Amino acid sequence: LNKSLLRFITCGSVDDGKSTLLGRLLFETKAVFSDQFSQLQADSKKFGTQGDSIDYALLLDGLSAEQEQGITIDVAYRFFSTEKRKFIVADTPGHEQYTRNMATGASTADAAVILMDARKGILAQTKRHSYICHLFGIKHIIVAVNKMDLVTYEKLRFQAIVEDYKLFAASIGMVDPSFIPISGIHGDNIVSVSENMKWHKGPSLLKLLEDINLEDRTTLSQPFRMPVQLVNRPNSDFRGVSGTSISGYISKNDEVSVFPSGKKTKVKEIISPNGS
């Protein structure tokens, strides 16, 4: 069976539970081998933040500084698969100073899971990451309200956050995000539907990811858009920008706009690995 591949990212503010969610997802989809699980148990005792319980975030936080500080710094890529689809997920950092690492993860993603802490709701970094996802043309946005166990799985709290986010999404032009209440640490609504939130009638997070339609991926008919990942300056006579085109096409002498400044310029030359 030739299964489709979905690239997605997890993003949101610091401590909203991104790494824990993904660690749980990897564990539940049998993407963790027995030796990895043994190491996870040992690391949980040494570095964990969950007492005697397994700290699933440690499956993603690979740098020693990340484990010791309990944070994500670099973008961690992981692969897993189900009977229906293959996935490559980028776990991106929530701290403001690592935002450019998050943007790198967003530049190749088909979908984004934007996490929020049910106790805190929308924060500045939630908005920043949401705007970056929208700017990079990510069409499939899933807003996951995490840590629902800490608000006693309260339906009204979830609904209030949904309404707040809908207003924000409309203000930046984001269309039709999906919403799901979850608990990454307890596995509620991650792989299977939660018994603790029977009031929520939607599918699990994994089912939402499996059902994303990739047929509407960006085509050449749409305007040219390229997230800049590197400014090339090998010498004082040359300055170029590198990145992956995510829509449209570009030709020499075409006028382009640079965001967020909105300044306009023209394409002087297009250079590929084979030359101009």
Tell me what each language-model feature is.
Residues 21-25, 39, 101, 125-132, ...:
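Alpha-helical scaffold elements adjacent to nucleotide-binding pockets in ATP/GTP-utilizing enzyme cores
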Residues 85-87, 92-98, 106-130, 134-159:
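Conserved Switch II/interswitch segment of TRAFAC-class P-loop GTPases
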Residues 1-100, 109, 144:
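P-loop NTPase switch module centered on the Walker A-proximal segment
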Residues 18, 34-35, 123-124, 150-155, ...:
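Switch/connector loops and helix/strand junctions flanking conserved nucleotide-binding motifs
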Residues 7-11, 150-153, 157, 167:
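C-terminal effector modules of nucleic-acid-centric enzymes and ribosome-associated factors
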Residues 15, 21, 40, 70, ...:
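Residue-level signature of catalytic and energy-coupling elements of molecular machines
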Residues 159, 166-276:
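Conserved catalytic-core segments of large NTP-driven translation/proteostasis enzymes
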